[in-house]
Every structure is written in structure tokens, then in C-alpha cells.
């Protein structure tokens, strides 16, 4: 992430919400779904779970946001793969942020993967940079599980696993 590009995009303004859905660092492009009952044990190659660029990638976009885009008391939301929680939390801590809680998107259907169980949820860290707690956005306290439908296959934009708009609308 280029800080100069972020600066140009923000044009001197600062956002009170830092809501992101960065790459999950798994080798999935929407075309490599597993086939039912196929033995995939030999197909977990070197790259399917390669996170070697992960911390650098996450640190880069976080640093650009802090330097050029968000207010001191911005609320942070970051969707991520469960597999990357420790790495993401370490990146947040390096930037002075902490994970206040986790939001779970409960999908209306499971996603066929090579895992032992169908993924029917996605986690999202919610937090901020200490000591700058952001104000609550809702008058009432919302649950930490958000039940939202997934996009139908023919409704998806140019991304294999898009988030529903409410995943970003609720924090707004």
C-alpha cells in the first residue's frame, strides 16, 4: 500500500472508520473449489497456505492508514481468515491498536472447502488505537454475531468471496 496514494485519495480528510477486508493469504481464487468426496490430502501444496508476505502486507496498509487516512479515535474493523488471527493481532499491536472484540459473520450457507468442516462464518476483529476509544455507532448494543446472506453466485462482483454490504454498513 502506497502512503502517497492513500494521501492523494483522502485529499486531506480523515476517516473515523478503518474497515478492511484484506487478502486472507490462502491460495483461493474462486475456481479451485474442491470436488465432493475427492481426496485432497496431496493437493495442499506449498502455496495454499503461504503467509510469508502477510505481516509485511498487513503492516503496510495499517501504517498507510494511520499516517494518512484515519483519525486517532477511528474504529478498526478487519475481516480475516481464522488462520491469520495471531499474525493480524500482532500487526495491530505493533501499530498501537488492540482487539476489543471479535465479530462473526454467520453466513446463510457453508462454503465448500478442503477443510474438515464447512466454513459458515468469517471473523472480524474490532478495536482501536489505545487510548482513543471510538464512540459507539448504534444506540442499542448489537450482538457480536451478524447473520447476513451471502451473494448468490450470479450476483458476485469481480471477487470470489465478497462481503455483504452490511458487513461495512453496520459499523458505519
What are these regions (language model features)?
Residues 1-172:
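Core catalytic lobe of class I
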Amino acid at each position: 500500500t502506497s502512503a502517497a496514494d492513500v494521501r492523494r485519495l483522502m485529499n486531506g480528510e480523515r476517516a473515523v472508520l478503518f474497515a478492511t477486508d484484506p487478502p486472507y493469504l490462502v491460495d483461493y481464487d474462486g475456481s479451485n473449489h474442491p470436488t465432493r468426496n475427492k481426496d485432497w490430502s496431496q493437493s495442499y501444496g506449498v502455496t495454499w497456505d503461504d503467509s510469508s508476505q502477510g505481516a509485511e502486507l498487513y503492516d503496510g496498509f495499517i501504517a498507510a492508514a494511520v499516517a494518512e487516512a484515519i483519525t486517532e479515535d477511528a474504529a478498526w474493523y478487519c475481516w480475516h481468515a481464522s488462520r491469520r488471527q495471531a499474525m493480524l493481532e500482532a500487526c495491530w499491536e505493533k501499530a498501537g491498536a488492540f482487539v476489543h472484540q471479535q465479530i462473526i459473520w454467520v453466513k446463510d450457507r457453508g462454503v465448500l472447502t478442503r477443510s474438515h468442516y464447512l466454513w459458515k462464518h468469517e471473523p472480524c476483529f474490532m478495536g482501536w488505537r489505545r487510548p482513543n476509544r471510538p464512540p459507539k455507532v448504534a444506540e442499542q448494543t448489537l450482538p457480536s454475531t451478524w447473520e447476513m446472506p451471502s451473494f448468490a453466485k450470479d450476483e458476485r462482483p469481480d471477487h470470489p468471496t465478497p462481503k455483504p454490504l452490511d458487513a461495512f454498513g453496520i459499523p458505519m
